[in-house]
UniProtKB/Swiss-Prot annotation:
It comes from the Bacteria. It comes from Geobacter sulfurreducens (strain ATCC 51573 / DSM 12127 / PCA). GO terms for biological process: translation. Keywords: Ribonucleoprotein, Ribosomal protein. This is Large ribosomal subunit protein bL28. InterPro entries: Bacterial_rp_bL28, Ribosomal_bL28, Ribosomal_bL28/bL31-like_sf, Ribosomal_bL28_bact-type, Ribosomal_bL28_sf. GO terms for cellular component: ribonucleoprotein complex; ribosome.
Length: 63
C-alpha cells in the first residue's frame, strides 16, 4: 500500500507509451503523494496523501 492515498484510495494507473512509429511500451503513472502530519481520530499521525486531497481540504494538518 505504499503508492496509495490513505484518504481517497487513489493508486497507480497503467497504460502504454506510444511512439510516432506506433511502438507501445507499458508504463505506470503514480499519484502525487506527500507525507503529511495530520490529525486523524484525535491523534497526530504521518500519512501519505495525494495533493488533490490536501488542496480540497480533506486533511487537517497538525501544527
Amino acid at each position: 500500500m505504499s503508492k496509495v492515498c490513505e484518504i481517497c484510495g487513489k493508486g497507480p494507473s497503467f497504460g502504454n507509451n506510444v511512439s510516432h512509429a506506433n511502438n507501445k511500451t507499458r508504463t505506470t503513472w503514480h499519484p502525487n503523494l506527500q507525507k503529511v502530519k495530520a490529525v486523524r481520530n484525535g491523534s497526530v499521525k504521518t500519512i501519505k496523501v495525494c495533493t488533490r486531497c490536501i488542496r480540497s481540504g480533506h486533511v487537517t494538518k497538525a501544527v
